[in-house]
Amino acid sequence: MNSLQLLDYFAMFAYFLVLIWIGVAVVRSKEKRNQYDSFLAADRNMNLLQTTSSAAATDIGGGFSIAMGGLGFTLGLSGSWMIAVSGLSIVMVSFLMVPKVKRWSDKVKGLTTGDLFAARFDRKTGTLAAVVIGLAWFTFVGGQIIAGGKLLQVTLNMNLTFAVLLSGTIILAYTTMGGLKAVIYTDVFQMIVLMVGIVFIAVPIGLIEIGGWNVLVEKFNSSESTKHLLDWGAVGWRQMLGWFFAVFPVWFISIAAMQRIIAARDVKTAQRGFFLTGIPIEWPLFAVGSTMIGLIARFLIPDLSDPEL
């Protein structure tokens, strides 16, 4: 095992140690004013950093982080437009939805989307909404669990099935013990790691490794099969339209987004946090940065069997 491998394992160990410490600290915290408010809505006291980080981490967590690298590998820079659509969506939500939802949730003291439906209509409607939301979220949470499993598979050389089961157990146990407050504190830490890792570490080191941006451009432009990787319009309008219909509505119906709005300190904090998530975090920092990692991987390992790994 060389020094780089040792450094990698040390970094992963330190990362998970910090996450465990955050969860334990939240569970043992005596600052909870109300048990349910703390568990479901983080005491309705999220500041701007927490709101922004948690909203961003909700969208660009493990699933998108892995997927965008894969899009960068196969589609190149134009793959970043998928996240640009998401960024546009959340900016629109910050103006059109955030103020109304935040004021309404504070007025009726609702802690969940089901509570808001119950307050607006009746208890049966609220219960039905909660059931539908729970069923729908199996798919989203499943994507995050699979992303975590793939990470464990690659980094620790695990069987994929076992890695996914382990990932799911950790995620569910962590959330159940610490509630939304633990998730939010974790989101802040993870967003710092993610953005610093992509923008200031992975991309610069990758470009240095291949000899710089000009070398990458020269190599990809030298072949017809890779020229499209540097073309911002390579995906075409049909693909863009598909992304728009698939991605743009998500923030308007996202239960995770609703929960972050409810948990924010006030309307202004929620609105600013969501806007900053769209611009500049999702676009251009994460979108371009993550696709650049895929491009660099295409340069270094063109025959990679699974672009998402």
What feature does the model see in each segment?
Residues M1-I66, T175-G178, T269, F275-L276:
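Membrane-interface "cap" regions at the ends of multi-pass membrane proteins
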Residues I20-E31, V98, W137-V141, I145, ...:
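Hydrophobic alpha-helical segments and their helix-loop junctions in multi-pass secondary transporters
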Residues S38-A41, D115-D122, A130, V154, ...:
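Short amphipathic alpha-helical coupling elements at transmembrane boundaries
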Residues M1-N2, L71-L77, M97-R103, K150-V154, ...:
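Membrane-water interface regions at transmembrane-helix termini and the short interhelical loops
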Residues M46-T52, A118-R123, T127, Q190-P204, ...:
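Small-residue-rich segments of transmembrane alpha-helices in multi-pass membrane proteins
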Residues L40-K109, Q239-F245, P249-V250, A257-D303:
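Membrane-interface helix-loop-helix modules in multi-pass membrane proteins
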Residues F117-A119, I296-L309:
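TM-loop-TM module centered on a large, flexible mid-protein loop between adjacent transmembrane helices
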Residues W81-T175, G242-V250:
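Helix-loop-helix module between adjacent transmembrane segments
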